[in-house]
Amino acid sequence: METYYREEELKSLGLKKYGSNVKISRHAIIYRPEELEVGSNVRIDDFTTISGKVTLGSYIHIAQTCGLYGGDAGITMEDFTTLSSHSLIYAISNDYSGLSLACP
């Protein structure tokens, strides 16, 4: 079994957009893939979780066990950036909309 999704498998993930030479680990977790935009020459390693509105530029490496939680606000990583292992990025820390119970 290959470590990263093949090109035809990337199509079936339902990503909003992706460029060329994209490597996403089969062990990465992507929630709401229809909101994930990925540029070219991007690698996402094992056990990374991506959720919500996330935009990744080109020439990006996201190491293992990272978390990008974009929610509705969104996260953007610009070109030529890296995220070291175990790093977490939150667009918001809680839901203050009043539409649901948060932190009971």
Language model regions located:
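Extreme N-terminal tail/first-helix region
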Residues: 1-18
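Conserved catalytic submotifs in the C-terminal HATPase_c
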Residues: 25
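Flexible, glycine/small-residue-enriched loop-and-beta-strand segment within the central core
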Residues: 2-7, 28-38, 43-104
